[in-house]
């Protein structure tokens, strides 16, 4: 058989080596980040790529300063965690119900709403920044976390994804639950939502990543330094009056940890959710 042929074995080995090299290429910036976080600013500002591993200049002083009780870093870190948690939960809650409704219920204007969702998906966020800002000012939500969260409690991408996934749910369960006297909300939360775990797992990863990395909108809305999120706080370390590259790099190391932890928890749902949800129609 082909799988036992020498040509196939060589192909598998070559393909494995290729992906190993590609993985190392992707991991190289992470290695540089970890290495740079252990060096002082004087070493980081050297000309050229500095990959020297010198125990004499490398230390954990950057992390010691970062963990100092007087450091505002953990305030930024906590702000990002809270905003990311609330934004992700609200986005999944509303987007899943909207997507489920568009897939299951037959009502007038359903297709028009779905087309509008597709159109909004194609509009860059930057195009909507000015009207969103004017609306936020009118609601007196500037320099508040509500102003940061409110525009993102419904995601057109998540609505589309949940709708596509819900199209594959068995309708017999709906009829059986209705015959047993279950309410529509009860059907969704008790029966259909558990069946949509892969979709929720995939969206938790994507929405958490979007919320954690959200930079432009919080930068526009937030004014107080104590309310900054982590991306804004780290960017504030770079200024015309001085650049704290050592703090920036060590802070960036911890900034990637929550995303890695979330992916490790929900990775088993990620591929299956994207695969199934992306092909239903």
Curated annotation (Swiss-Prot):
Signal peptide: none annotated. Coiled coil: none annotated. GO terms for biological process: transmembrane transport. It is found in: Cell membrane. Pfam families: BPD_transp_1 (PF00528). Its main location: membrane. The keyword Transmembrane applies. Keywords: Cell membrane, Membrane, Sugar transport, Transmembrane, Transmembrane helix, Transport. One of its GO terms (cellular component) is plasma membrane. The chain crosses the membrane at residues 15-35, 81-101, 112-132, 142-162, 185-205, 247-267. Residues 77-266 form the ABC transmembrane type-1 domain. Induction: Transcription is repressed by glucose and by the binding of AraR to the operon promoter. L-arabinose acts as an inducer by inhibiting the binding of AraR to the DNA, thus allowing expression of the gene. InterPro entries: MetI-like, MetI-like_sf. SUPFAM superfamilies: MetI-like. Part of the ABC transporter complex AraNPQ involved in the uptake of arabinooligosaccharides. Transports alpha-1,5-arabinooligosaccharides, at least up to four L-arabinosyl units. Responsible for the translocation of the substrate across the membrane. Belongs to the binding-protein-dependent transport system permease family. MalFG subfamily. This is Arabinooligosaccharides transport system permease protein AraQ.
């Amino acid at each position: 058989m082909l799988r036992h042929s020498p040509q196939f074995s060589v192909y598998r080995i070559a393909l494995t080596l290729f992906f190993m090299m590609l993985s190392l290429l992707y991991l190289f910036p992470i290695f540089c980040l970890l290495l740079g976080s252990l060096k002082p600013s004087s070493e980081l500002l050297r000309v050229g790529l500095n990959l020297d591993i010198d125990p004499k200049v490398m230390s954990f002083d950057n992390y010691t300063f970062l963990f100092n009780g007087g450091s505002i870093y953990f305030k930024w870190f906590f702000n990002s965690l809270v905003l990311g948690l609330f934004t992700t939960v609200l986005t999944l809650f509303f987007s899943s119900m909207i997507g489920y409704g568009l897939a299951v219920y037959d009502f007038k204007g359903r297709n028009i709403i779905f087309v509008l969702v597709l159109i909004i998906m194609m509009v860059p966020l930057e195009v909507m920044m000015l009207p969103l800002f004017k609306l936020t000012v009118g609601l007196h939500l500037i320099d508040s976390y509500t102003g940061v969260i409110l525009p993102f409690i419904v995601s057109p991408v998540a609505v589309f994804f949940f709708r596509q996934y819900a199209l594959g749910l068995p309708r017999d369960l709906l009829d059986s639950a209705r015959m047993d006297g279950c309410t529509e909300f009860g059907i969704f939360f008790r029966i259909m939502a558990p069946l949509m775990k892969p979709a929720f797992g995939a969206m938790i990863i994507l929405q958490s990543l979007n919320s954690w990395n959200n930079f432009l909108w919080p930068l526009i809305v937030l004014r107080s330094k104590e309310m900054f999120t982590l991306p804004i706080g780290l960017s504030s370390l770079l200024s015309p009056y001085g650049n704290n590259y050592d703090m920036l790099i060590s802070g960036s190391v911890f900034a990637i940890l929550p995303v890695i932890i979330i992916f490790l928890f929900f990775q088993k749902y990620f591929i299956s959710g994207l695969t199934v949800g992306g092909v239903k129609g």
